[in-house]
């Protein structure tokens, strides 16, 4: 791994592998992958991951810890994840602040009820995960459409979890925008309420406008102008944090994705102040 500060990154997807392998150094600062998709993978795909990891630092964004679930954390899987993170010298590992299992995998990221009981439950699981992984983790604010039971606001819930678990936040700017539209809150006020010291990374992605008051987080389209504007505001508040462009399907030519990562870099430079390595 090259010891380079992480500023502007791109999600590592198998559908992008041929072009990523041909990508010139300096186009992005790092790549982000889901460890679940690569743990134990050998053969041609494993070799391609190793090739990319030799050229670019790797960050990881998990999919299946189910931090809000009720079943015990999968300690065997956490052990495999720790070895993967250690092998690739991963300094930024994040997971969704959600649950995705209930007596079986649900194949979706579902919101946790915004209650004090849930704060205590998920915080204990985050602390356990951090102990087993031997590192701090960042939780990501998710998009949600059917609001869970809310004894507190989403912002207050996230703040309480960050404090009680003593973990970090991966701020998904698109999710803030989508949730603000769908649940009628002010996105800038949400950003203002997040503790600066907890934010260690960001995501930007595209969404679908189902209706003026209904946005759907898809990761299948270019980032929209309103999200770019909100990202600029996030850079002003949190600095030039490591930021990943997420694109999960409908892949355009790599040059179009790199134009978006170049825009991330430009907004970081113009709005983020001193960069944080």
UniProtKB/Swiss-Prot annotation:
Gene3D superfamilies: Divalent-metal-dependent TIM barrel enzymes (3.20.20.150). It comes from the Bacteria. Belongs to the UPF0276 family. NCBIfam families: PRK05409.1. It holds the Pfam family MbnB_TglH_ChrH. This is UPF0276 protein PSEEN3355. Signal peptide: none annotated. InterPro entries: MbnB/TglH/ChrH, Xyl_isomerase-like_sf. SUPFAM superfamilies: Xylose isomerase-like (SSF51658). PANTHER family: UPF0276 PROTEIN HI_1600 (PTHR42194:SF1). Transmembrane segments: none annotated.
């Amino acid at each position: 791994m090259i010891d380079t500060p992480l500023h502007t990154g791109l999600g590592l997807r198998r559908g992008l592998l041929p072009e990523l392998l041909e990508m010139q150094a300096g186009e992005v600062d790092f790549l982000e992958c889901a460890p679940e998709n690569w743990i134990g993978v050998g053969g041609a795909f494993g070799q391609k991951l190793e090739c990319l990891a030799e050229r670019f630092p790797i960050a990881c964004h998990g999919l299946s810890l189910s931090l809000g679930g009720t079943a015990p954390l999968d300690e065997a899987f956490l052990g495999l994840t720790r070895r993967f993170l250690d092998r690739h010298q991963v300094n930024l590992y994040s997971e969704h602040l959600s649950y995705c299992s209930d007596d079986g995998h649900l194949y979706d990221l579902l919101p946790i009820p915004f209650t004090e009981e849930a704060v205590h439950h998920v915080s204990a699981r985050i602390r356990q995960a951090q102990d087993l992984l031997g590192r701090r983790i960042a939780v990501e604010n998710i998009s949600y459409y059917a609001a869970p039971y809310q004894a507190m606001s989403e912002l207050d819930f996230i703040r309480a979890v960050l404090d009680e678990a003593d973990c970090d936040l991966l701020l998904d700017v698109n999710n803030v925008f989508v949730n603000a539209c769908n649940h009628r809150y002010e996105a800038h006020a949400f950003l203002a309420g997040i503790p600066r010291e907890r934010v260690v990374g960001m995501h930007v992605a595209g969404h679908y406008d189902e209706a003026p008051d209904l946005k759907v987080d898809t990761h299948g389209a270019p980032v929209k102008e309103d999200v770019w504007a909100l990202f600029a505001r996030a850079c002003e508040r949190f600095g030039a944090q490591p930021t990943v462009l997420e694109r999960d399907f409908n892949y355009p030519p790599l040059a179009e994705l790199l134009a978006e990562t170049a825009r991330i870099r430009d907004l970081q430079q113009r709005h983020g102040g001193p960069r944080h390595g």
